[in-house]
A protein has these predicted regions:
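Pyridoxal 5′-phosphate
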Residues: 1-396
């Protein structure tokens, strides 16, 4: 397959792309940048010691770890004291839910169309602390959206927390979190945002977003299998520390880290930041081309239902596109295409069961999801379209 020079330069940075498999399952985890792989190997080869030691290799290890914190914080426009790393977004949000302190009868508002990572912890919190749980439920249909104006009837002087996604891992739809933050803050509530499906596609500025807590996974942003949670200094006043009694509790890492930030993975984050910092305009433009190509095909198929915003506007969606085909079970369709091609994409509910079953009205096999990122090419999308068309044809 031929690539233009820029796209070839991009793809050359990802060793996994130098094989026949075509990756359209990027929402489940992106491929890893070459310098990240090298950094992890080098750390384990020469600096794999406990942090804080005074000997030479110990100092080098500690410096690399600290550089990871510095780079990650700067990347999202935060301070190092405001971030913590962990094994997954699910784990970090669960830790957060155990650290937050509210009073019986206080209210929390939880989006019902999120990934379960940003739902289950809050349902559990409400049960443990005798809180009133209010569901933020967009109307059922193929394009449910989280809009700040729909919060009006859910917020009150007793609201303490609002939770939502920045971009749906099924729909690809972008939530205006600044509007949601303003609405939540108008009644003195905190806002917690799951940005896992947003972070691979757009730059992040937590101060501009106005969020109190913000979480995403670096392994979906071309990096190592590690996740990160931001908590503003003011929001941290609502937290108790989960750490040992004799340890400090000043930073978010002190409060929630529980020694879960793998050293070799965390210290590789500067390589991701270095790669992305100068590329965002090209990333967004490339993904716009990809989603335009696929959506144009799907829109013209009368037997296809697209879920989420049915256009390629980058202000409204990211390049995660889900659909179903009349007369086809999603599992059977994906496997039929995979049996005839090298295209890797998925079917299912992707841990957004409430969204898929309630809002979209689908069963356990859920949607067909094609999730693209900037290292994918228009030619790859055209190839997938041909493979899809061979299977679903002109049936209606």
């Amino acid at each position: 397959m031929a690539f233009d020079n820029h796209q070839k330069d991009v793809r050359d940075r990802f060793p996994a792309l130098q094989q026949e498999q075509v990756f359209f399952d990027n929402a489940g985890g992106s491929q890893t940048l070459d310098t990240v792989i090298d950094s992890i190997r080098d750390y384990l080869s020469s600096t794999n010691v406990q942090l804080g030691a005074s000997y030479a290799v110990g100092k080098k290890s500690t410096a690399a770890y600290s550089a990871g914190y510095q780079a990650a914080a700067k990347y999202i426009n935060a301070n190092p004291d405001e971030i913590v790393f962990g094994a997954s977004t699910t784990q970090l949000l669960r830790n957060l839910s155990y650290a937050l302190k509210f009073n019986p009868g206080d209210e929390i508002v939880v989006s019902r169309i999120d990934h379960e990572a940003n739902i289950a912890s809050w349902v559990d919190l409400a049960e443990r602390q005798n809180l009133i749980l209010k569901w933020w439920k967009p109307a059922p249909g193929p394009n449910p959206q989280l809009l700040a104006k729909d919060l009006a009837g859910l917020l009150s002087s007793k609201t303490r927390l609002v939770t939502c996604t920045h971009a749906s891992n099924i729909l690809g739809t972008i939530t205006d979190v600044r509007d949601v933050a303003d609405a939540a803050h108008s009644v003195g509530a905190l806002l917690c945002v799951d940005a896992v499906a947003y972070a691979p596609h757009r730059p992040i500025d937590v101060k501009a977003f106005g969020v109190d807590f913000y979480c995403f996974s670096w392994y979906k942003v071309y990096g190592p299998h590690i996740s990160m949670l931001y908590g503003s200094w003011s929001a941290q006043t609502h937290l108790r520390s989960l750490g040992h009694f004799f340890n400090p509790s000043a930073t978010l890492e002190d409060k929630l880290g529980l020694a879960a930030g793998s050293y070799e993975l965390l210290q590789s984050i500067p390589k991701v930041v270095e790669y992305l910092d100068s590329k965002w305009d090209k990333v967004i433009a490339q993904e716009a081309s990809l989603q335009y190509e696929l959506l144009s095909y799907l829109i013209d198929k009368p037997n296809v239902t697209i879920y989420g915003v049915p256009n390629e506007h980058v202000s409204e969606r990211v390049a995660t596109i889900s659909f179903s085909v009349k007369g086809w079970n999603s599992k059977d369709l994906v496997e039929a295409v995979e049996n005839k091609s090298t295209y890797a994409f998925r079917w299912g509910t992707f841990y957004s069961d409430r969204l898929v079953r309630e809002a979209l009205g689908l069963g356990k096999d859920g949607v067909v999801r094609v999730s693209m990122v900037h290292y994918n090419t228009v030619d790859e999308v055209k190839g997938l379209i041909r493979a899809l068309d061979e299977v679903i044809g002109n049936s209606s």
